[in-house]
Amino acid sequence: MSEQTQQQNSEEAVENVEAVETVETVGNADGVQEQAAAEPAYEDLQARIAELEAQLKDEQLRALANEQNLRRRHQQEIADTHKFAGQKFAVEMLPVKDYLEMALLDQSGNFDALKMGVQMTLNELQKAFDATQIKEINPKAGDKLDPNIHQAMQAVASEQEPNTVVGVMKKGYTLSDRVLRPAMVTVAQKEA
């Protein structure tokens, strides 16, 4: 390479170094400005994060308190339901009690009047049962024994098919499909 070319290359190299130094200086100046600008944005973000965290914590506490209130209210409703479960039936039974008390107060000795009073009482009791969905289990002779609703009290020799109802000793009752008392029945067994 010639001296002139070397000198030209040296001058270009010096110019490039100066240009790089200028860019770095400008870059550093911009970086300082960017860093200075970034710090307020960072602080704003930190403040916003703290604000959102506080808001979230407040919402969590409110949700927890609401859940506890709902649980307490639900438990109170269950307790009230148990406490007053028989209220409807009790109200329905009041006229029955009234009729029985009137029958005891009757001093006439009239058997027909007493019988009529008992019939009225039975009618009121049946109304109370209907209103509270208490149904009779009253199987007929020949019905198949159902252990879910019948209780075999005795077995008797009969011409009927075995394990069928021969007679009813006491009626059974259900409350909304739940057996309160099974019907107490006599069932047929094979003749010996």
Swiss-Prot record:
Keywords: Chaperone, Cytoplasm, Stress response. One of its GO terms (biological process) is protein folding. It comes from the Bacteria. It holds the Pfam family GrpE. GO terms for cellular component: cytosol. SUPFAM superfamilies: Coiled-coil domain of nucleotide exchange factor GrpE (SSF58014), Head domain of nucleotide exchange factor GrpE (SSF51064). CDD domains: GrpE. Its main location: cytoplasm. One of its GO terms (molecular function) is adenyl-nucleotide exchange factor activity. It is found in: Cytoplasm. The keyword Cell cycle does not apply. Participates actively in the response to hyperosmotic and heat shock by preventing the aggregation of stress-denatured proteins, in association with DnaK and GrpE. It is the nucleotide exchange factor for DnaK and may function as a thermosensor. Unfolded proteins bind initially to DnaJ; upon interaction with the DnaJ-bound protein, DnaK hydrolyzes its bound ATP, resulting in the formation of a stable complex. GrpE releases ADP from DnaK; ATP binding to DnaK triggers the release of the substrate protein, thus completing the reaction cycle. Homodimer. Belongs to the GrpE family. NCBIfam families: PRK14139.1, PRK14140.1. This is Protein GrpE.
